[in-house]
A protein has these predicted regions:
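Terminal accessory/targeting
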Residues: 1-58, 74-83, 198-238
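Catalytic domains of cell-wall/extracellular-matrix polysaccharide-remodeling enzymes
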Residues: 119-228, 233-238
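Residue-identity detector for glycine
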Residues: 5, 9, 22, 32, ...
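Active-site beta->alpha N-cap acidic-glycine motif
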Residues: 33-122, 128-129, 135, 139, ...
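Homeobox/homeodomain signature
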Residues: 10, 16-17, 101, 114, ...
Length: 238
């Protein structure tokens, strides 16, 4: 599968970050995409205490959703799990969703930028792409008091100037059960549990009730196998 120049830049940018942090990355190919993760050996080597538990990051795109996201937050809190949420700016501003974002932040979840309208950044002029990201930065910072550092580009397509934007770290994924395409919770859970490896970044969506159900089940099963869930900043920087 050939990789576009923009997407290759995505991989190179994240690779450089990991090399800077002294971590050994590997490339994995899934569903025609290539994304970056951290191998189990490199994750363990970064922990001075040599933790026994393998770590993975649970990430959610496209929220918040007024009905399904609170249910997810309840489940994560009960299981003492922290996740990473890549939020759409216009969704944050809907209804009572600002309260949900505030709760995310207060409960220790990492909040990232997923653009304001879920647009394909690679197809926008530089100024338009910058506006999409900065508008969402502003919306999130208004609630949390902190501007998000981490971002995920919709469709995995980065803006043309992403390599020059040193203020933002783009995060990909390594396990994608395509939960947005099905309401079959069992199939989503099966895909993740069968494909998971230490250091993986799991992609799910908190805007779908079936995905929320799958996420909670995934947490239960992987915790039962000894996995620990961390936010993406801890996964790549610890």
């Amino acid at each position: 599968v050939m990789m576009s120049g923009k997407r290759w830049g995505y991989v190179v940018q994240f690779f450089c970050l990991l090399v800077f942090l002294g971590m050994s990355p590997f490339l994995t190919k899934m569903d025609g995409r290539k994304t970056m993760s951290v191998s189990s050996d490199s994750v363990r080597s970064q922990n001075v205490s040599d933790e026994v538990k393998p770590v993975v990051a649970l990430t959610f795109d496209d929220g918040p959703n007024a009905s399904s996201t609170p249910i997810l937050l309840d489940g994560l809190k009960e299981r003492k799990v922290r996740a990473t949420f890549f939020l759409i700016g216009e969704n944050v501003e809907k209804d009572e969703n600002e309260k949900i974002v505030k709760r995310m932040y207060e409960e220790g979840h990492l909040i990232g930028n997923h653009t304001y309208t879920h647009c394909n950044l690679s197809k926008l002029e530089t100024g338009e792409a910058k506006k999409e990201l900065e508008q969402t930065d502003t919306v999130i910072e208004k609630i949390t008091g902190k501007q998000p550092v981490f971002a995920r580009a919709p469709y995995g397509e980065l803006p043309v100037d992403s390599e020059q934007d040193l203020s933002r770290i783009y995060i990909g994924w390594t396990v994608d059960p395509l939960d947005w395409m099905t309401e079959d919770t069992g199939a989503v859970v099966k895909t993740v549990v069968e494909e998971i490896n230490p250091g993986d970044v799991i992609l799910l969506h908190d805007c779908y009730p079936s995905s929320v159900q799958a996420a909670i089940r995934i947490v239960d099963l992987l915790q039962g196998k000894g996995y620990e869930f961390v936010t993406v900043d801890h996964l790549i920087m610890d």
